[in-house]
Amino acid sequence: MAKNKSQYDSTLNLPKTLFEMRAGLPKKEPVMLKDWDDNDLYNQLMKHNEGKPQFILHDGPPYANGNIHMGTALNKIIKDIIIREKNMEGFQAPYVPGFDTHGLPIELKALSSVGEKKKDISKLELRQICEKFATEHIDIMSDQFKRLGVIGDFEHPYLTLKPEFEARQIEIFGEMAKKGYIYKGLKPVYWCPDCRTALAEAEIEYGEDECDSIFVRFHVSQDPNGVLAKHGIPMEKTYFVIWTTTTWTLPANEAICLNGQFEYSFVKIGDEFHIMATDLVKSVMDSCHITEYEVVGEPVSGAEFELMRYNHVYLPKEGWVILGDHVTLESGSGCVHTAGGHGVDDFNVCQKYPQIPITVPVDDGGYLTEQAGKYAGQRVWASNKTILADLTASGAVMGQLHIKHQYPHCWRCHNPIIFRATEQWFCSIAKFREDVYKAIDTVTWMPDWGHDRMHGMVRDRNDWCISRQRTWGVPIPAFYCKKCGAYHITDATIKAVSDLFRKEGSDAWYKYDAEQIIPAGEVCEKCGASEWTKDTDIMDVWFDSGSTHAAVLEERPELRFPADMDMEGGDQFRGWFQSSLLTSVASKGCAPYKSVLCHGWVVDEQGKQMHKSAGNGVEPSEIIKDYGADIIRLWVASSDYTVDVRAGKNIFKQLSEAYRKIRNTARFILGNLDGFDPNTDCVADDQLQDIDRWALAALDDLIVNTNAGYAVYDFNKVYHAVYNFCVVAMSNFYLDVTKDRLYCTNGTGRKAAQTAMYKILVALDKIIAPILCFTSQEIWDFLPKTEAMNKYVVFEDMPKAGQYAADDAFKAKWAQLIAVRDEVKKVLEQARADKQIGASLEASVTLYCNDAVYDLLNSIPMDELADLMIVSHVELVKGEGGAASAVEGLGVAAAHATGDKCERCWKYSADIGTHAAHPTLCARCAAVVEG
């Protein structure tokens, strides 16, 4: 009797695997992480690649004060993809994570934690609380990075608070000081009155603020050159008109600056005369809503007004009229209110006139001092309204506009900042700026616009203010002579401080008096005295992180200087990229990195910045909980990270679908490799069918494209190549047309398909390993192994192109065969729509061919050609016929296949029942069943 249907099902080689369709990554990934940790994966990888060329990606240290966000995840995953790929490419690529641990945010958190006690707490006690806070967050962030699949030496990260780091930082400071690049001086700096400290340019962010834009007139008091008399203008009725948006700086006014190259006019309003740039008269009058005015006499060169005097608008003092090239005709009146204590240009131009004092009537908390007269005690922002009201009442204000403008804010407290001249420590960029330009030219910038951005920033920047008036940081290693006040920095003092810090850490600066630190025998170079005090400032945290090239690359035995790559977000052009570059060029004369790779910001699905208050943020922990870390990694790889990267729940949902297609490709192949032993079952190349060779050639193309993508860190190219290969080349074509051979046969043909699939999946898994680190290892665990294969896929070598390459003739042949197949599919779809057939195996196809097409198709065995079309029968006919197609010389006709349907393979055949024991099977299936 014939066997029943279920018995025939059991004779099929249907896919069988424990590799699950549903990934379950949120549960599986932690299990893998534990295995990696238990087996010391990172150190084993370093040992495995020992002796290979090094690739050093130097980690820019994130600030250790909170949970990671999507931007941090983007950054760390890009680095991890690079590290994993380089280790598989033939390098030993160590990854030493770092953490930036000093600075104001941690200090403020520490102060907040002690509440009212902060008034009584010592600096040393505060520093100990800060260190504890930073250390706790290092552990939290390290665990979060590892949860993303990031591998590295998390057991031994570099920390800017470590004694050995601080000691090396002091030495870098000393090297720069010895070369004359470090100095102390009075200069206007960015000052945060809320944080009560100076700020560097890298610590400034701009936001839109509203303010009053006012035109104020200052009465002329002296005309030593007789300019007014020469032009018949009465001095007692003449005023200079200035424009300002910082009313609070008027108490500090000491000068009005004109441009000596511009022409100025006398504008008569009523019986009074007002001096302003000729080209700006109309705009000033329009802004002040003055329609009745007259320009009197001929224009006068700005240079003629130099050293005239005027009365301050409310204080009992006179100011000077001076000249400066920074005065422009873009806005205002051409007469610039100049307060040397509150602006860089103002300060610089005042330096040319020794008689002009630098007045700073604002304390470190942003309150006006007694120098501001009756406004003393008012906060600068509040004083704007008071001063404006008084000046308006006195008639000094000619016009007023309420405007919105971009204004600098502190990036830590996010409040507006001021310019304030104070005694600070600076790095003199001007002294080695040309050397920095040369160093920039030696670096490979990715994207290449990075070169011009860095060059422009270095060109336009002022000297670097490196001192901060806070407690939690590396102290400025300077001593002061008690007798004359001169500061003292020598090779001996730098060595003494660095040795002390290396032994006890920078807390020692606060434990010991100056005499206990400074070497015996040191005397003041100015007065010869030998009694000392210590500096109370700390270094800018950008000097901390900017010293990593020395404190980490040069000190860690597994690393080296310079790094092959620094990779961070675009904001680091003014941050870590630049501070590292400056300290390296200043101390060593070269760049600290060979290449710089830059990524953009993470924004929401509409391209807007993420804010908690807007409710448009997405946290890595949420995505990991819902989808797993591999989906975040796929998001990184699928994005063009050189621009802003969009993230949101819809995007991750779409990516999970893309991931599923890649996973299911692997699952299908694994299912068909059940029982396959690559040590014994692989067939020789000459036993492969043509379509197997095509699949391997497609794999070779994939290897070429993905290797090219990895080489330039274009993971988006890698992702799209992998996705298209899995969906188009594999799922939609090769894996589909080989099903009959895999399911229904047991001979060489099946093993040929398995051999090709095995090679494909081994290579594919290696390709995706840097990106999908968890899934690739899961696939690897299920793959049948040869003795040469490692336990972990990341220990494997990346596939090399050429092993499966096909010549151009073969590729052209198969491109035409696929084109023919596409035309057949169109005709089958129409036959299905016309109810002639259901599944494509119900069809018989006749192909009408010219000689060239006939020869092409006839080169393929008819059973293989039928499998290619997924039909039961194919007939080739020379000549015209059937439906016209897009392939020249080809016509296609489809009909319902003749014969009966085989119960096992579902193909239609005339030989059904030729085996008496199996009346419902075709001859091939009956032979297979009988064995």
Predicted segment positions?
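Structured ligand/cofactor/substrate-binding pocket environments in proteins
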Residues: G71-I83, G90-Q92, F99-D100, F165-R168, ...
